[in-house]
């Protein structure tokens, strides 16, 4: 009864003329929208913002102005640092490439004859860290898509390296070229996805010897963003560097000054760097391209069961890889990658988006800042479908990497099933969440006009703000309009068939693919790219055994 009286009082307080005025504004704005935009707005459904050119997008070059969180005191941080150096000095790493061991020995590392074992004096590691650039720019073929790495910059890359792909209509299936291209097109369609991050799904219908040629040329033609090359043999790196150079239409000398390509270097935990990864560091760092050294340390499996122990091992492995980039070329751009989580101790299955993962992400950020090296993290979850688990594990991951000072976020959109599957619907859910993060990071406007004193003065006690000039001038852009949230009341939502987030995401990804526009590409560059790919295919591509 009391609630009903309050509702009546609220309704009586509204000045209907002002409400009508606001509705008229809505009708006028809807008259200029496309039918699809009007349909998204109807019934209280909030939807995507109008498409804008990259130059006008608010989602490029995100800056994280929040103070980073910490889980380690200064003493604890120093203890982790010293323990990591002790591992490198006393236990060492297995370096499974003779050329890499020779380079390390020449730089001052201790190589045990007849073995792969290399030990690093702590002074050597610290000397190598001193030449790592704290920030740099990755250059896209469209300069508006350049991304700033390091400092307070926050860059999102889409899902990468999934062997399977899924959508609600077709279900889970092996990766293929058609789905690869669709996911790449989706990455191009959203400005909050700043780079592609490798193959969003592995197209196994393309032979492995030439797969990189088809995929990398697609990344040049279907997007105008920075992209990734896999370190799976020296020649793949060289082909990737040349394709990136052709895509930008620049000489190699400029390419070496302006990094345009990145590679993920995963250690083979515990304490091992394999041949293809080391070759990748040599080829990429020697040519000034970006290396992202990322140990994959699951506590209780490939690392100690304690998160502190796993982070110590992560740090030791990362420092060894980072130091090697500087042995190859002083000042080579590199990132500190952290990917420590835990396993389900009942099954051994990896777990993501957990409290332990969050602690490891924030601790990794503290270490990266200690060394003044840009920090790579990931948006993770272990859910097998688009459900509450997928959302809350990703939300915790995003919270940790944002609060932990992450600079470069792999698997930002589309990661499902612990990385085994790229999901079209999860991609849309993640994009929505990434845009929310971006909006949260937008500085709060506290200008005199934003403080709204004149609006409060005009309305006074007991009034409302629906029809004030202050509201009418801002209502379209005052708040973030989610892609997927359904804000209709229960009755209207029921009449519409009770659609779920899964339903909306399925619809939206199809709409975005239908609206995809290929970015312009100079015909001369296209011809040079096609000629290079054709020549390399004729030469047989690359060997498929390592």
Where are these regions (language model features)?
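Long, compositionally biased, glycine/small-hydrophobic-enriched stretches that function as flexible linkers
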Residues: 2-58, 111-113, 117-119, 136-140, ...
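Short acidic (Asp/Glu) and glycine-rich catalytic loops that position anionic groups and cofactors
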Residues: 59-64, 105-112, 298-299, 341-344, ...
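N-terminal alpha-helical transmembrane segments of multi-pass membrane transport
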Residues: 57-132
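Catalytic-core signal marking the mid-to-C-terminal active-site face
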Residues: 2-4, 21-22, 30, 36, ...
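Glycine-rich anion/phosphate-binding loop at the beta-strand->alpha-helix junction
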Residues: 264-433
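N-terminal small/glycine-rich loop or linker at the start of catalytic domains
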Residues: 56-63, 74-85, 148-169, 199, ...
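Catalytic alpha/beta active-site cores
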Residues: 89, 101, 110, 116-295, ...
């Amino acid at each position: 009864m009391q609630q009903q009286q309050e509702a009546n009082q609220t309704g009586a307080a509204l000045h209907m003329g002002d409400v009508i005025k606001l509705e008229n504004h809505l009708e006028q704005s809807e008259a200029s929208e496309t039918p699809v935009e009007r349909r998204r707005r109807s019934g209280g459904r909030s939807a995507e913002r109008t498409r804008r050119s990259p130059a006008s997008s608010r989602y490029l070059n995100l800056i994280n102005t929040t103070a980073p969180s910490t889980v380690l005191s200064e003493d604890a941080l120093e203890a982790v640092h010293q323990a990591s150096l002790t591992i490198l000095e006393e236990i060492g790493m297995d370096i499974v490439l003779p050329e890499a061991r020779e380079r390390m020995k020449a730089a001052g590392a201790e190589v045990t004859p007849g073995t792969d074992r290399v030990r690093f004096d702590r002074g050597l590691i610290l000397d190598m860290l001193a030449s790592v650039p704290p920030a740099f720019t990755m250059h896209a073929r469209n300069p508006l898509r350049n991304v700033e790495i390091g400092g307070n910059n926050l860059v999102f890359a889409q899902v990468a390296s999934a062997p399977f792909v899924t959508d609600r209509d077709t279900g889970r299936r092996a990766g293929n070229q058609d789905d690869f291209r669709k996911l790449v097109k989706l990455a191009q369609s959203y400005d909050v996805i700043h780079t592609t991050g490798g193959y969003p799904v592995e197209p196994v219908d393309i032979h492995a010897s030439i797969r990189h040629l088809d995929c990398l040329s697609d990344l040049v033609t279907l997007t105008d963003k920075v992209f990734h090359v896999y370190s799976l043999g020296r020649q793949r790196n060289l082909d990737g560097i040349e394709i990136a150079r052709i895509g930008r239409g620049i000489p190699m000398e400029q390419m070496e000054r302006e990094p345009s390509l990145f590679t993920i270097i995963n250690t083979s935990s515990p304490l091992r760097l394999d041949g293809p990864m080391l070759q990748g560091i040599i080829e990429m760092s020697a040519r000034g391209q970006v290396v992202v050294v990322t140990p994959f340390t699951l506590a209780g499996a490939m690392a100690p069961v304690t998160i502190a122990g796993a982070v110590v091992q992560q740090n030791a492995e990362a420092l060894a890889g980072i130091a090697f980039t500087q042995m190859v070329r002083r000042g080579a751009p590199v990132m500190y990658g952290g990917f420590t989580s835990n396993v389900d101790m009942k099954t051994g299955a990896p777990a993501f988006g957990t409290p332990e993962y969050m602690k490891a992400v924030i601790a990794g950020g503290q270490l990266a800042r200690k060394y003044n090296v840009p920090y790579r993290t990931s948006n993770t979850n272990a859910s097998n479908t688009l459900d509450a688990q997928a959302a809350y594990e990703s939300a915790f991951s995003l919270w940790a990497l944002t609060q932990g000072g992450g600079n470069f976020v792999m698997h930002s959109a589309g990661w499902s099933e612990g990385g085994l599957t790229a999901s079209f619907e999860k991609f849309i859910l993640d994009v929505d969440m990434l845009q929310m993060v971006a909006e949260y990071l937008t500085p709060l406007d506290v200008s005199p006009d934003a403080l709204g004193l004149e609006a409060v003065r005009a309305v006074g006690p007991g009034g409302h703000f629906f029809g004030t000039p202050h509201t009418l001038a801002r209502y379209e852009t005052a708040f973030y309009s989610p892609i997927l949230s359904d804000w209709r009341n229960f009755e209207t939502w029921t009449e519409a068939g009770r659609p779920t987030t899964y339903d909306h995401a399925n619809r939206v990804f199809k709409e975005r693919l239908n609206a995809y526009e290929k970015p312009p590409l100079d015909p001369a560059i296209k011809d040079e790219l096609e000629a290079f790919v054709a020549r390399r295919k004729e030469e047989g591509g690359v060997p498929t055994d390592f």
